[in-house]
């Protein structure tokens, strides 16, 4: 059974395990939406790793949630106030009138744990975290997997639309056939 907990100083080794040592997560460490322009283009994988480590270790708010199957970490979801993500604030994909809400920006579910409901549990955990900090709503820019052929797993880091709809999110707008802004009250 999968359980989800907010990321905190003690969970850093688990977050690092989920990110792995190869592939996009091991280079980005969920910093893409937190950095813009030269701050992003000039950052190295080591810089990004240290950025997330500092957020997990020292942040006022947990920067996300970690999913566990027993004691084994099996997933990560980045979630936080919209204002924590400068790239989200500036992006046309995230245009909204809910500026005080929270956003889910990223999922990482390692190979071997996919298609087992981990992403759905991560969304529920992200909603719980947002609610516990008084967020009025949570938004995400989901991927509609029904509008195209096979979508590579690396392109699903924002989360499939079907996972959000199953968790009670509703479609707000589309910036393309594939990118769908979804929202749900946090409560």
Briefly describe each language-model feature range.
Residues 1-38:
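Conserved N-terminal entry element of GNAT/NAT acetyltransferase domains
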Residues 29-63:
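Active-site rim helix/loop that mediates acceptor-substrate recognition in acyltransferases
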Residues 58-62, 68, 72-110, 114, ...:
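Conserved acyl-donor/pantetheine-binding loop and adjacent beta-alpha core of acyl/acetyltransferases
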Residues 80, 141, 175:
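Conserved residues at the C-terminal ends of beta-strands
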Residues 123, 130-152:
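Conserved GNAT acetyl-CoA-binding A-motif
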Residues 154-187:
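C-terminal "cap" of GNAT-fold acetyltransferases
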């Amino acid at each position: 059974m999968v359980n989800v907990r907010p990321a905190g100083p003690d969970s850093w080794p688990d977050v690092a395990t989920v990110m792995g040592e190869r592939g996009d997560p091991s280079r980005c460490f969920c910093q893409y939406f937190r950095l813009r322009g030269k701050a992003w283009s000039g950052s190295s994988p080591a810089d990004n790793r240290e950025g997330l480590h500092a957020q997990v270790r020292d942040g006022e708010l947990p920067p996300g949630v970690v999913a566990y199957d027993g004691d084994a970490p099996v997933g990560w979801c980045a979630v936080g106030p919209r204002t924590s993500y400068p790239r989200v604030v500036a992006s046309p994909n995230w245009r909204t009138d809910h500026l005080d809400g929270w956003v889910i920006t990223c999922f990482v579910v390692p190979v071997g744990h996919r298609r087992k409901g981990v992403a759905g549990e991560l969304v529920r955990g992200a909603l719980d975290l947002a609610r516990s900090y008084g967020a009025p709503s949570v938004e995400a820019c989901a991927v509609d997997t029904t509008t195209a052929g096979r979508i590579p797993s690396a392109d699903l880091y924002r989360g499939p639309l079907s996972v959000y709809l199953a968790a009670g999110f509703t479609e707000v707008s589309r910036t393309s056939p594939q990118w769908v802004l979804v929202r749900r009250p946090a409560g």
